[in-house]
Amino acid sequence: MITMALNFYKYYSRQIKYALHFNILNNSIIDAENKYINFQKPLKNVIVSDSMFIDTAYLLKIKKMIKSIKGVFWADFVLKKYYPLYSDYLKGKISNVGTDGKINYGEILNINPDMIFLIDWNIFNPLSKWLDKNNIPYTKTGNYKEPKFLGKMEWIKFYASFYNKYKKAEKVFNKIIEEKRRILKSLNSRSIKYKPVVAFFGYHKNQPYIYGKSHYIPNWIREIKGNYLFENVEGTNYHYIDRKIFNSRAKYADVCILDTMGEDIDIKELLKNNPHFLKFRAYKNKRFYITTKDYLKFETLKCSEVMEEYVKIIHPKIYQNGDNDLKYFIKVV
């Protein structure tokens, strides 16, 4: 079961360098709710709501971790990005245990999981209470609210630790740290006289939303000498914003990046449904981008490459090919 951690342990003999929302102390794992997680190793049956768990399994090539996945929330959407997991899902080897507001409690009992990995969203609070009542072990994850790119990436240590692969995760993570240093060293060796204004945002049901200035993407934008447009928005979470207010500000941004959140966006349809984009400075100057449908998983699988592509987008002139060889973003025009 899960027991509450004492706060002072969070800062004692800390093994985690960048992440703020989990810790590992003397082989003990502390999750996003500051709770010690006790479990039987190795895990053979797990249920996941956090796709970064799956990304970590593939990044570190932990076969036992992949094999242990027996249930996934939003499986129809999440597993399409992963093969052969999606094939296993279609064959009935992996179950869809729930979507927004609809939890398949019976299937959770059938799986009899050794651990459930839940994102620490409010929608999972009723499920958490039910799991406590039924003595089913679970842990809460919060990589999405880390204020630093490397903080989010460091969560690979959290997931890997459940499979005795902490050292493997640490080795991979340390290489990413070195890559980040290389990126910044190269950038800082150039004379950057102007810091472009960047609008990083999303759209859901034709409603724009923006991220707080402490989110890891705005922080990275600042670190690579860009100015985040929505500096007045606090926190790490996203916030819906009135369309007129959004348009009045975003139209003057030098760079626009639309986070598609895994959707396969048709650019012609996007511009047809949002003709105001055509009036944006970023569109007129051919600096309007959208993320690819698989972008989110590549934040983990190809972290350093994704970080560098932000530099290419914000400062294309310092690269020989500019922003013409992007893998994880698509130029709208």
Curated annotation (Swiss-Prot):
PANTHER family: MOLYBDATE-BINDING PROTEIN MOLA, VITAMIN B12-BINDING PROTEIN. InterPro entries: ABC_Transporter_SBP (IPR050902), ABC_transptr_periplasmic_BD (IPR002491). Residues 45-318 form the Fe/B12 periplasmic-binding domain. It comes from Methanocaldococcus jannaschii (strain ATCC 43067 / DSM 2661 / JAL-1 / JCM 10045 / NBRC 100440) (Methanococcus jannaschii). PROSITE patterns: FE_B12_PBP (PS50983). Pfam families: Peripla_BP_2. This is Uncharacterized protein MJ0642.
